[in-house]
Amino acid sequence: MMKTVRTPILEIGFLELGPPDGPPVILLHGWPSDVHDYDGVAPPLGEAGFRVLVPWLRGYGPTWFLDPATPRSGQQAALGADLRDFMDALAIPRAILVGYDWGGRAACVAAALWPERVSALVSITGYGIQDIAASARPGSAEQEHRYWYQWYFHTERGRAGLTANRVEMTRLLWRLWSPNWVFDDATLRATTASFDNPDFVDVTIQSYRHRYGNAPGDPAYDDLEVRLAAQPPIRAPTIVLHGEDDGVGPAAASIPRDRLLTGLRERRLIPRAGHFLARENPADVVAAVVRLAASAA
């Protein structure tokens, strides 16, 4: 069931499943995607007794900015603060967080900056806090090639391309990043409808430019960005899941940052899974949440 809640910045649309008095689990989607990432995860968790919340991030679907003057920023501090504010608005003191890509970044930011709010973390692809100061250093030629869309978004041609071709770009990236996932047009269209949000393009472009220091952030988050620049550790009990065939973020590349997950309990490489692991292997995500919840009981 779709609900909405207001924070100081946003009206956030979200799905809620399971008993209202169950242990809260917040599932956070990635880009280019939306809450449908967790269609195979949320119902089993709800049936297992968890209170499951699946919000649309800023710039997606029914999540709206309250003030036209608020900068349409997709920077990491904003995503993390939105998550904290979402929990505050619903009077949730602590939750298990699950996320990947943009949603994984929001979860990691919240876990690092407000550890008292996070009882456990399932981080799909690992430590997700950006090291913006180091972003000027180039990666391997292969990795630079994987990030072609990010360089594209640094141009006004890229902004125009995302505006005009967001459905076909999503189809292409899904195929490149999860090469073994077979999806149909109805699945694609169900998600890309969320990109009709009038702020989707602006939030996306700002996010990809800001992470390389090529766009200013919202000054409201300057203090948080300073804290994130220190690459703070995440102490919450954590399970990392990584798709063996992730076409944008290879598993080997994330392992060195495991040292920042000081509560790491387990890292699992999922055979044949790609970037959209929660869609491809939802049972693995459900199992990770259940294991962490059991260990915390």
What are these regions (language model features)?
Residues 11-12, 24, 60-94, 98, ...:
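Flexible "cap/lid" subdomain of the alpha/beta-hydrolase fold that forms the substrate-access gate
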Residues 30, 101, 279-280:
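Conserved acidic functional residues
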